[in-house]
Amino acid sequence: MNIHEHQAKEILREYGAPTSNGIVIFDTKNIQEKLKVLKTGNFVVKAQIHAGGRGKAGGVKLVKNFKDLEKEVKMMFGKTLVTHQTGREGKEVKRIYIEEASDIKSEYYLSCLVDRESSKIAFISSTEGGMDIEKVSRDNPDKIITHKVEVAKKIEHSDIEKIITPFNLNIEQKKDAYKIIEALYQILIKKDASLVEIN
């Protein structure tokens, strides 16, 4: 079962992973009232469809004030997005996730999945975040690190250190990385997921 990004963020928060503040909107009524929970002046408006490639199809927009935010939400609702994963018919935008924007200095890719061959959990990490990971795997396989861990009650710190090796993090960033990786590990096991991915 695929879930929407806003649902995945709720699960990540439930398991202690740091995430940006955001809200999901299912219609365009009383938008200003709904947006009051958001604090920053910069926002990311994200169409919620079950397909990758939303950004290239116009389904992810950065806006810098509440007026433009309301306008962008109204324009995006009901729009049909066509991406490399939707087919020609595309997918209609029926819900939108609005998130407080973060200053991006670096983008990373991190996922964990069940490796059936070894009966272990495989963590895949890359410094090439924000991109199509399949393309990175094909064009720059040296930019991807895979580390397999035993299925246990919790992940060992020595494993986490190996997983975050490519990221070159400072002490504070490592604290957040530990929380995120521990959350991914627990979500994969407790939610019986086949893949948990952050890109």
Place the predicted regions along the sequence by residue.
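A conserved helix-loop-beta module that forms one wall/lid of the active-site cleft
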Residues: 1-41
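Electropositive phosphate-/nucleotide-binding environments in soluble metabolic enzymes
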Residues: 2-6, 25-28, 63-70, 104, ...
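ATP-grasp fold ATP-binding core
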Residues: 5-8, 12, 39-54, 83-103, ...
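Gly-rich Lys/Arg/Thr-decorated short loops/hinges at beta-loop-alpha junctions or inter-strand turns
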Residues: 13-14, 54-55, 142-145, 155-165
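Catalytic core of tubulin tyrosine ligase-like
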Residues: 19, 66-86, 163
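Glycine-rich phosphate-binding loop of ATP-grasp-fold ATP-dependent ligases
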Residues: 20-22, 45-72, 109, 132-133
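Hydrophobic alpha-helical hairpins/lids featuring a short glycine-rich hinge
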Residues: 83-148
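Glycine-rich, mobile lid/loop segments that gate access to catalytic sites or pores
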Residues: 148-198
